[in-house]
Curated annotation (Swiss-Prot):
Domain JmjC: 269-414
Pfam families named in the record: ARM_KDM8_N (PF24472), Cupin_8 (PF13621)
Subunit structure: Can form homodimers (via JmjC domain). Found in a complex with RCCD1. Interacts (via N-terminus) with RCCD1 (via N-terminus); this interaction stimulates H3K36me3 and H3K36me2 demethylation. Interacts (via JmjC domain) with H3C1. Interacts with FBXL3 and PSMD2. Interacts with CRY1 in a FBXL3-dependent manner.
Region feature Interaction with RCCD1, mapped onto this chain: 1-107
Organism of derivation: Mus musculus (Mouse)
Main subcellular location of this protein, as a coarse class: nucleus
Binding site for 2-oxoglutarate: 270, 316, 319, 325, 334, 398, 412
Iron found in the keyword field: yes
Protein name: Bifunctional peptidase and arginyl-hydroxylase JMJD5
Amino acid sequence: MSEDTTEPLVGSSTLWKELRTLLPDKEEELKLDLGEKVDRSVAALLRQAVGLFYAGHWQGCLQASEAVLDYSWEKLNTGPWRDVDKEWRRVYSFGCLLKALCLCQAPQKATTVVEALRVCDMGLLMGAAILEDILLKVVAVLQTHQLPGKQPARGPHQDQPATKKAKCDASPAPDVMLERMVPRLRCPPLQYFKQHFLVPGRPVILEGVADHWPCMKKWSLQYIQEIAGCRTVPVEVGSRYTDEDWSQTLMTVDEFIQKFILSEAKDVGYLAQHQLFDQIPELKRDISIPDYCCLGNGEEEEITINAWFGPQGTISPLHQDPQQNFLVQVLGRKYIRLYSPQESEAVYPHETHILHNTSQVDVENPDLEKFPKFTEAPFLSCILSPGDTLFIPAKYWHYVRSLDLSFSVSFWWS
């Protein structure tokens, strides 16, 4: 039998059958619907890859899809991300889809499913939705056919569960009793919250809002590894995003945990501001959108949900966001400082456009000769603990430092 007609993975014929049912039966039923901004040569190459797939020429399809990925990758990495045309992101997703499917038709390797998952994650991270979110459906099938993984690793302190392993190089929690604390309320009525906090733009910690969320009982380092360990995610490397040596990289959740949480890494790694729950619906089922978001003007699907996962010592410099924000703490604690938008002059925003929403001041070690007004600016502070939901009004300056291994979920809404 020729290489192009390789049988499905040995012992995994059901995998191929399940994957194949996700696509239309006939080639002409698979609509690419590419826009005019996609080069004709690339569009033709993608159509050729689709034709090879439906003809059963897996190796040829694999080569064509990789060429499509090479072309579209260049387009995705030319200029600012906001300027990348969505059509090129769709082309990239189609390339990832075809490559992942072809990999599952190749001769069996122990890493086949893991590699196909990585390819799908690249499409989810860098591409755009195609064929009614087919990449998410492919991932769901692949995950059911994964071989049982290794037990989540323990850290250097083998006598402690991994969830209790934490780096010791971060400074201790400030004594917030000496500072002006953020007020706390337990599940206030919607209209009370609106009248006293949302409309006037006042921060508040809401207790009890997330008590019923499954994540509050289920999530641990081991659980996150079991659900998401093999998934590829973006990781920030460096103490804070304003530092010159700050960078971003892609790695699996398992690699992130091993390198930055269970090991004494030289650098700080942070899975920050990532829409993890769109990528991994299994985790999304463990959380809920706070009822208070219904007081906004937007629709529920317009709410941006981000994950913030990292070791002790991660820092988000003092900055402001344009939308209302609920920050829910699931694991660990965070020290947070808040400054009113009225104090913008005293927090010395960067003058460059790209960092205009970020302060130049190192909040816990300020250079008062360079930034003399900062010491006079009033602020609120708090220690956010598991189950707490902090309301951060739009444009409110906030600084965040994790005191423990930490997982937070933010909801940005209008």
